[in-house]
Amino acid sequence: MWGGRFSGSLAEHMRLFNDSFPIDRRLWAEDIRGSIAWANGLERAGILQAAECQELIAGLRQVYQEFEEGLFLPLTSDEDIHTAVERRLGDFIGALAGKLHTGRSRNDQVATDTRLWTLGALKLADDLIRDVQAALLEQAKAVGEAMLPGYTHLQRAQPVLLSHALLAHFWRLDRDRQRLHDATKRVSVLPLGSGALAGTAFAVDRAALAAELGFTSISQNSLDATSDRDYIVEILAAIALLGVHISQLAEDWIIWSSSEWGFVALDDAYSTGSSLMPQKKNPDSLELARGKSGRLIGNLITVLTLLKGLPSAYDKDLQEDKAPLFDAIDTLSLTLPVVAGAIRTARFNTERMESALDDAMLATDVADELVRRGVPFREAHHIAGRLVREAEQRGVGMRQLPAESFVAAHPSLTDVAGLFDFARSVAMRDVPGGTAPNAVRDQLIAAQHVLAEG
């Protein structure tokens, strides 16, 4: 493909070093689609005769069939997917294959292939995330008005509905979906026709190419188009954050599944045992999901570091952009179905959750009631805090303090028995986005609409 300038061949270790076919071979379908569109473009530009174009396309379809059926046999001379396809095309149709690359560079070719592949990968990622969301929504609907302690700093804070806690992860994942969806318009930009860096010298209709390949726009600057990998960074950043959200979900559930908490039990299908300790049931599905987030963050850092030192236009360093992108999508494809399955099959111990609720978690309700009785909140906060301390010193729950303690704390606290009701505390948070049953019902409806809209 490029040997005319050189008098010798590559050293064997340099050939192996330069070879990207093991990585970019998965772009075979996109490469052939792009080549068919390019052949049509060359015909429209008068570079190819109609019969030549038809023969090229027929040959490309033969190559496509070989890949599709797993029959394609690479040669050591196939340094990348582009040379492999063109070489095999030549086997089928002879010298005419040499006309296909007219006006095209591997620089704009690989940029086009990768964008085409990424558009398909974004749809896959969306489906995978939606499935995890659906699993969370199914469980949130099933648990009714079960309550558990809500935690801040891993300390018991206030009671919340279990459904509310589950939906918190739903909305995080929805933001991840939105970020990936928003990136689509920046992926769907056609670089084909940009040549190596200066643009093709032939009058190819780039808008027609974009329409044929399903791109929504064409690039505006050929030098930028051949080196632009912003969209990969953007997608890897969104996926890294998705990984963090999955890790946070996993961390919550790993803690909940411990013997000390006992709030949730994972199904055997998503747990493993110990080679030494027969009693162990480990939440390895979620631990591995938590661990994969580091890999996803690493992929982002790899590409950012790759791009940092590059001058304008294409450099061979960019050959290293695809492995992190492919790995990110592969990791999601492996991880998210496991997470969805672990969620769907989990069993919640709602009695254990509700038994973990304690009176101190209602201290805010005492302060809120004082505010309703005309006490400034800061003073009310201080009064409630003193009552918590007194209960701790006596070794009792707040509700077990004598009536005199409440009246001594503030004269208005003459009837407080009704405050020590966890269901009441939850019901009082009846604002949009709150944990009250009414608010959570609205949230469930909103979540259902999000999934229905696709």
Swiss-Prot record:
GO MF annotation list: argininosuccinate lyase activity
CDD domains: Argininosuccinate_lyase
Pfam assignment, any one: ASL_C2
Similarity comment: family membership: Belongs to the lyase 1 family. Argininosuccinate lyase subfamily.
Catalytic activity: 2-(N(omega)-L-arginino)succinate = fumarate + L-arginine
Top-level taxon: Bacteria
Protein name stated in the entry: Argininosuccinate lyase
Record's keyword terms, sorted: Amino-acid biosynthesis, Arginine biosynthesis, Cytoplasm, Lyase
Compartments (UniProt record): Cytoplasm
GO biological process, one term: arginine biosynthetic process via ornithine
Pathway as given in its UniProt record: Amino-acid biosynthesis; L-arginine biosynthesis; L-arginine from L-ornithine and carbamoyl phosphate: step 3/3
One GO term describing the cellular component: cytosol
EC number(s) on file: 4.3.2.1
Keyword Membrane: no
Gene3D superfamilies in the record: Fumarase/aspartase (C-terminal domain), Fumarase/aspartase (Central domain), Fumarase/aspartase (N-terminal domain)
Class in the EC hierarchy, top level: lyase
Organism listed in the record: Herpetosiphon aurantiacus (strain ATCC 23779 / DSM 785 / 114-95)
